[in-house]
């Protein structure tokens, strides 16, 4: 488990490129037949990936010890979105078939969660966010057909994109975790511009569906103290509440967003005009 401490905005603006990457970038999300796990002190979110290839993968008791509990989800809820080939997730003996871009919410208290791929030549890639939970909501599969896509932006401003809200109150109940997937139209490069912050929630972006020679310049920092991180395919970035989170790519891309914090009101955000950015 890679533990990331909270960081004050006044400290963050003094960091150089490598220091910013050390604090906020999750460089390697998927490793064959293993789980990766980054624990952030910011709202206690856990972020990572699971890619079963030659065997099944489960999160063992060693993580429970690190979290001070008996097992991983004793006091947590889990959200998973599969960006790879078809797979399965077995939760306490109940098997869910999770295809490409299908998702699974796993409620607090699930003791055994086992991840598998249907074909080792086309492994599933389970990206997950995990957050503290105060009560148990039912485990539920969510498919792209279950969400209501919302298209925003314009080709003229190179930010036409479709937002798919997987784990939001209109789709299913969670304690605090919200997740979704945003896909840019071909030829569009910007996400979340004009940008915003949200004082009451933190957020993690996971960029994927990118060519090897492509990158995203992810914008972060306070609106008047912006910085950037250069990100490549299948990398994630932690965004504190005080930070903007926007990006521009060399080509179109897709990203998964996950939020935890005070509320789940999607539009509860503090907008920042482009003219006010520095």
From Swiss-Prot:
Record's cofactor remark: Binds 1 zinc ion per subunit.
Record-linked InterPro entries: KduI (IPR007045), KduI/IolB_isomerase (IPR021120), KduI_N (IPR027449), RmlC-like_jellyroll (IPR014710), RmlC_Cupin_sf (IPR011051)
Cofactor(s) named in the record: Zn(2+)
Pfam families with a match to the protein in the record: KduI (PF04962)
UniProt record, GO biological process: D-galacturonate catabolic process; D-glucuronate catabolic process; pectin catabolic process
Catalytic activity: 5-dehydro-4-deoxy-D-glucuronate = 3-deoxy-D-glycero-2,5-hexodiulosonate
Record keyword Acyltransferase present: no
First-tier enzyme category under EC: isomerase
Gene Ontology MF, one: 4-deoxy-L-threo-5-hexosulose-uronate ketol-isomerase activity
Keyword Isomerase: yes
Protein name: 4-deoxy-L-threo-5-hexosulose-uronate ketol-isomerase
Native source organism of the sequence: Enterobacter sp. (strain 638)
């Amino acid at each position: 488990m890679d533990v990331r401490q909270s960081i004050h905005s006044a400290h963050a603006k003094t960091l150089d490129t490598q220091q910013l990457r050390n604090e906020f970038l999750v460089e390697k999300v998927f490793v064959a037949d293993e789980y990766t796990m980054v624990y952030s002190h910011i709202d206690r979110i856990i972020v990572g990936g699971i890619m079963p290839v030659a065997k099944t993968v489960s999160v063992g008791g060693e993580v429970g010890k690190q979290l001070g509990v008996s097992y991983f989800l004793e006091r947590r809820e889990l959200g998973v979105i599969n960006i790879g080939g078809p797979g399965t997730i077995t939760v306490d003996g109940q098997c869910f078939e999770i295809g490409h871009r299908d998702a699974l919410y796993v409620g607090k208290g699930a003791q055994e969660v086992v991840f598998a791929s249907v074909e080792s030549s086309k492994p599933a890639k389970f990206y997950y966010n995990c957050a503290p939970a105060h009560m148990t909501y039912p485990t539920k599969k969510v498919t792209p057909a279950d969400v209501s896509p919302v298209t925003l932006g314009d080709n003229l401003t190179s930010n036409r994109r479709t937002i798919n809200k997987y784990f939001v109150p209109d789709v299913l109940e969670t304690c605090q975790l919200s997740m979704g997937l945003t896909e840019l139209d071909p030829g569009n490069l910007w996400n979340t511009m004009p940008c915003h912050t949200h004082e009451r929630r933190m957020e993690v972006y996971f960029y994927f569906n990118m060519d090897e020679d492509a990158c995203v310049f992810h914008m972060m920092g306070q609106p008047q103290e912006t910085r950037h991180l250069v990100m490549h395919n299948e990398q994630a970035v932690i965004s504190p509440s005080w930070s903007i989170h926007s990006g521009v790519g060399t080509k179109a891309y897709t990203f998964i967003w996950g939020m935890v914090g005070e509320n789940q009101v999607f539009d509860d955000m503090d907008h920042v005009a482009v003219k006010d950015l520095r």
